[in-house]
Amino acid sequence: FGDRKEFQILPSAVVEIPTLANLIKIKAGIISNFDFPTLNHLRIENPYLSPLAKIESNNQMDIFAKVYFITKSNILISLKGGYKMGNNDYFYTLDKNAGLNNMFTLVYDNTKTTYAQLDLAYQIDKKIDLSLNLLYQNIKTTDLEFAWYKPAFKANLLFRYNANDKFSISFVPSFQSKVKCLNPEGEVEELKSKIDINLAANYNYNTKLSFFIELNNIAYQRYFNYYNYPSQRIVLMAGAKYAF
C-alpha cells in the first residue's frame, strides 16, 4: 500500500585512539545519518524558498579521520578529512513557476564529496574567546551540472571579549568562495565570492532581560547569497530580548 520505499542499511563505527598523555587524540570511522529537513529549517537557510517546494529525505555516509591536539596553554586544534557519499541531497534553484523569478525550489541528486576541515579554539582567562573554522569541499554531482550554491571554500572567525558577566563584544568576519547557479534562462552563472564582517555588543541586564546592538557587513560589500537577492551594504540592528 502507498509508495514503495527502498530498504537501506546505514552503518556507523568510530574508533578513538588517545596518544601522548591525551594531548593528541585520533578518531576515524564511518558515520551514516538520515535526515528529513523541515520547511522551517529550509526557510531559515533560504528565505525565498517556495512554500510549494517538494521536501524529500536524504542520507549520507561519511568516511573520515580526525586529529585533535590540545596544548597546555588551552589551545584546541582539530584537523579532519574525509569522503562523503550523499543520497538524494537537496540543492536550490529558481522556481520556473514563479513569474517574477523571485522564488526558489528544490532539486535532488546523489553526491560524492571530498573535504578537509580545520578548527582552532582558544580561551584566555574566560574573558577572550577566539575560534577559527576553515572548510574545503569538492562536491561532485551525478546528474546536476554543478552543486548549486555550494562553495568550495568557507572561512569563519570569531573573536569575543567578555568584559564581565553582563557585557560582551564580538567581532565575526567570514569568507565564502564563489558559487555556481542557474539564471532564469537555465544558463550557468557564477556568484562572486563574499566577505562579511560583523560587530556585535550584548548587555545582560539580568537573567531574563538583555540588550544588543549589531552592525553587519561593515566591509560594505554587495554580494549575492542567492540569485536576484543582493545583500545590504551595511545593516544596523538594535533591540532587547526578554525570556519568560
Predicted regions and their residues:
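Exposed, low-structure sequence patches enriched in small/polar residues
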Residues: 2-244
